[in-house]
């Protein structure tokens, strides 16, 4: 089986459906569903590839917090190798709250968190070098990795 390294933006999404309005003050609104997912252009892609039967190795960053535990737990349940995810002490795992509207619109409230800290030093070069395929997702959402760090990583992947 071919190995795919899926590297980049890993986000824990909290989705609420259907949200017509945010109640004022301390009021409550009842909705149909709340769920959490592994999301972002690396984590979400990893889950999809794992569902298709690929051997997936996740490379990115997550906090040493409960959100990071939940995110990696979801990915592990799909058989994704998360052993190369860097746990960043004292930095919140990247997360998004999505109040999904009845018409399907998805405004987002986002914390960049650990994705803002991901850099070339976090990349397991031997894993990238030996992968059959490398997917990098999340340009412009990883300020330390964008640019030169991405170029260095792609040179390793050759």
Question: What name fits each language-model region?
Answer:
Residues 1-61, 66-77:
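Glycine-rich phosphate/adenosyl-contacting loop at the front of the ribokinase-like
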Residues 15, 29-36, 94, 103, ...:
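Generic hydrophobic-segment detector
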Residues 59-64, 83-92:
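Beta-strand->loop->alpha-helix junctions that form or flank phosphate-binding loops
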Residues 1-11, 73-87, 100-158:
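Ribokinase/PfkB-type carbohydrate-kinase core domain
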Residues 52, 91-94:
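Short, basic and Ser/Thr-rich N-terminal targeting/leader segments
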């Amino acid at each position: 089986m071919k190995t795919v390294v899926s590297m980049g933006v890993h986000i824990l999404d909290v989705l609420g459906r259907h949200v017509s309005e945010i109640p004022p003050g301390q009021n409550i609104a009842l909705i149909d569903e709340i769920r959490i997912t592994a999301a972002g252009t690396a984590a979400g892609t990893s889950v999809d590839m794992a569902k298709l039967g690929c051997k997936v190795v996740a490379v990115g960053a997550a906090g040493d917090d409960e959100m990071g535990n939940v995110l990696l737990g979801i990915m592990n349940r799909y058989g994704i190798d998360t052993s190369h995810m860097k746990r960043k002490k004292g930095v919140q795992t990247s997360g998004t709250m999505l109040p999904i509207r009845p018409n399907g619109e998805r405004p987002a409230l986002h914390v960049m968190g650990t994705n803002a800290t991901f850099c070339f030093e976090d990349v397991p070069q031997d894993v990238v070098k030996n992968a059959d395929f490398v997917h990098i997702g999340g340009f412009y959402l990883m300020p330390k990795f964008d640019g030169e760090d991405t170029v260095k990583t792609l040179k390793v992947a050759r």
